[in-house]
Amino acid sequence: MKHYDYVLVGSGLYAGVFAWYAVQNGKTCLVVEKRDHIGGNIYCEDVEGIHVHKYGAHIFHTSNKKVWEFVNGLAEFNRYTNSPVANFKGEMYNMPFNMNTFSRMWGISTPDEAKAIIEKQKAEVTGEPKNLEEQAISLVGRELYEKLVKGYTEKQWGRDCRELPAFIIKRIPVRYIYDNNYFNDLYQGIPIGGYNAIIEKLFENCDIETGVDYLEHRETYDSLGDTVIYTGTIDAFYGYRFGKLEYRSLRFESDVLDEENHQGVAVVNYTDRETPYTRIIEHKHFEFGTQPKTVVTREYPVSWQEGMEPYYPVNDEKNQELYRRYEELAKKEEHVLFGGRLGEYKYYDMDKVIESAMRRAEEIFG
């Protein structure tokens, strides 16, 4: 059988960027993917001529010029700007929190008026915030918290905000200007034609096997390569030796609607506790689509169980301590490197995953 320099387990962005660098440096790569397609969570499906983000909305944004130039070398990006809207019991608010939000909520028009209201409400919390609720109120005040943070966050994490640690929300962007651009980054956009074009370029000249669980055939695949790049869950790699790390998962429900424009924006967050989903995505708006039909996806957060897709690491102290024990094992591996959101048990935006893979590749290939 053919022998490879690298066996890459998983085919998301981390594996893809590493594979691209490896091939550029004359190395051979075999990709082993459990799903029936490559691309990890940025994979898109074509439905009615619309590129549907199968695993939730992915909006590329970065301030790293090197990363931006790298992805633009793989695909052309459009000028999509993320400007989601929050729906609280039928009241519509612009996100992130800015003068449009404050004007709608309080009927005010100046930054000084908004600041005065928020500062007064923030003062309710004195001393170090003991939980997420106190942390959020200390950042944005009671009213914004109750309407636009509390319900959404509790659905996301499946717990009351008073039971969640304060560090989950380090900051909440508050802008005293009329600006609905969600991200502060220098660059943002969506690849024209969807993310699949990027994935295909990253894995060009690699051999690929889909529908294969590496962990069930570990000895076979280990024997096929000099080094394994493992981007699956690190606890599963070690057979849950110290116990299972916690993740949050997502469930999606999609519908094709016989209308041209359902909600007028790509993302609407539902911030009340009673609506069971956290948001509705209308995919065509990511690429300014004019198709006669539209595709909408409702997103439901769920607790992760084995066999489900792990999306978000639950980076509380208990899980971080458990991860550190697995990390110690990983450091002793001579022929296995761990990377990506699951391999490093870290919440990564796309640009940070690319940065991480670039760093690793440059350490190895120079």
Where in the sequence are the language-model features?
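Beta1/beta-strand and adjacent pyrophosphate-binding region of the FAD-binding site
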Residues: 1-14, 30
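Beta1-alpha1 glycine-rich phosphate/pyrophosphate-binding loop at the start
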Residues: 36-52, 74, 140, 156, ...
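Active-site/ligand-binding neighborhood in enzyme catalytic cores
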Residues: 86-227, 231-235
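N-terminal FAD cofactor-binding segment of flavoenzymes
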Residues: 57-91
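Glycine-rich FAD pyrophosphate-binding loop
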Residues: 9, 23-48
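C-terminal segments that line or cap access tunnels to active or ligand-binding sites in enzymes
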Residues: 226, 236-365
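A short, Lys/Arg-enriched amphipathic alpha-helix followed by its capping loop at the start of a domain
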Residues: 18-27, 202-205
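Short, well-ordered alpha-helix to beta-strand connector turns
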Residues: 4, 26, 206, 224-226, ...
